[in-house]
A protein has these predicted regions:
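Acidic/histidine-rich alpha-helical segments that form the ligand environment
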Residues: 67-112, 130
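Alpha-helical packing segments of well-folded alpha/beta enzyme cores
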Residues: 4-8, 41, 45, 83, ...
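Long, hydrophobic N-terminal alpha-helical segment
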Residues: 1-33
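A generic structural signal for well-ordered alpha-helical segments enriched in polar/charged residues
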Residues: 10, 14, 47, 93-100, ...
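Catalytic cores of transferase enzymes with a strong primary signal for eukaryotic protein kinases
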Residues: 1-14, 45, 50-58, 83
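Short, contiguous alpha-helical
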Residues: 21-70, 110-175
Length: 175
């Protein structure tokens, strides 16, 4: 959990606010939108883990996983225009809640496949991985590409020290 999150935070550390908020940098979304999405998923996971600990099926989490695109669209609509300070406050707070809930389960409860019938043979740890670090790993290369693009100097600011083809002829004929 921690190493992937750290890679994500290191990647975006150098980005200014306008780069984080720039629309359409990753598909139709901004980097900030992706961070909000991750927080929303992990918040849903916290609710789901609470339900599991109470012996209940985490129906909303399972429905979200069954239709990730729709869940993402709804969370995007709910959180559009969210303040960056709030985003960066919520991201670690929700992750801490996930980690606290992990401590509530035994190793067997986390790792045994088939223990929870509604997971279709998966372990609880596999579900947690899908929602947390596996999701971050899928988006990390996209975020890193935005960072590289944002940090790269624009080509049009480069001044060529060698004449372009045809420039010699223009200066020669002017003499």
């Amino acid at each position: 959990l921690d190493s992937v999150r750290e890679r994500l935070l290191v990647a975006i550390d150098e980005l200014p606010d306008d780069a984080l908020l720039a629309p359409n940098t990753i598909g139709n979304w901004s980097v900030a939108d992706l961070l909000v999405q991750q927080t929303a998923w992990e918040s849903e996971l916290v609710t789901g883990l609470k339900q599991v600990s109470e012996g209940q099926k985490p129906a909303r989490l399972l429905a979200a996983l069954a239709n990730r695109e729709e869940y993402g669209r709804l969370r995007y609509e709910e959180n559009q225009g969210r303040d960056l300070d709030r985003i960066f406050d919520d991201l670690p707070q929700v992750r801490m809640q996930v980690e606290e809930w992990l401590e509530e389960f035994t190793e067997k409860q986390l790792s045994q496949k088939g223990l929870y019938p509604w997971l279709s043979g998966q372990s609880l740890a596999q579900l947690i991985a899908r929602v947390t670090y596996e999701q971050e790993l899928r988006t990390l290369p996209l975020v890193e590409a935005v960072v590289r693009k944002w940090q790269a100097p624009p080509d049009d600011l480069m001044i060529s020290l060698t004449p372009k083809l045809g420039e010699d002829e223009a200066t020669d004929s002017a003499n």
